[in-house]
């Protein structure tokens, strides 16, 4: 395994944690909004053998400082890449991390050599239908300070998804996700930083998908919420030349549920678009 180095970049209101390993062209990994950069552990060895890989904990997650309020997540990424002297990279993000990568690629097209999004919806995407019942219960549990229940509901919502019961999901995936989820739940990151946009991309990504020039791969899990799958279809249809891949046995985190297929899919795409 490639030797990793880790560190922090200093920001005006705290520190942001990152890890770097490998040599070659640069690949940046952005995590989902209920876990942290450890979600990429199943990819780390395979990816760092071929690329210089950067992963980071967003503020309020993992080893980074808490997020005191709404953030411009694109700026956090821009500060990280500037600190690491990255001028151009392939951008891979999951869920909220994918939305951030998409916005960043639209704001800084010269910096995106490739764009890979998984389980994401573009900024400005309008959800249809009733929200998952877990959301309302999660907000209520948060008001009551019941962090254990908040975490349980987030794991049900995103790891199990709407089509499975907990006992139908790999228990190790559930355990690792719950471990990562503990920190943002304790920091109330979702409620402090994620529920309202701060300096959102204007116009939002949904209105600009046809302007994306980077080679793009859109991925989703077939067992995820139907709106996430619909968002993937919208992006795949609108982004010029976009490729798609659906993971048949996964919900929101295909990279953890089907790591071998995920790694092969990503590495094949990156090799193709070099």
What residue ranges belong to the model's regions?
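Conserved HGGG/HGGXW glycine-rich cap/lid loop of the alpha/beta-hydrolase fold
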Residues: 7-66, 80
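Acidic beta-to-alpha connecting loop that harbors the catalytic carboxylate
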Residues: 23-24, 222-224, 249-251
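Conserved acidic catalytic loop of the alpha/beta-hydrolase fold
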Residues: 74-89
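Short beta-strand immediately N-terminal to the catalytic nucleophile in serine-hydrolase-like folds
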Residues: 91-93, 118
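Gly/Ala-rich beta-loop-alpha elbow adjacent to hydrolase catalytic centers
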Residues: 93, 97, 101
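Flexible "cap/lid" loop of the alpha/beta hydrolase fold
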Residues: 103-107, 112-144
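Conserved serine/cysteine hydrolase catalytic core
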Residues: 179-237, 246
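Catalytic active-site module of serine/aspartate enzymes centered on a nucleophile-bearing elbow/loop
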Residues: 240-274
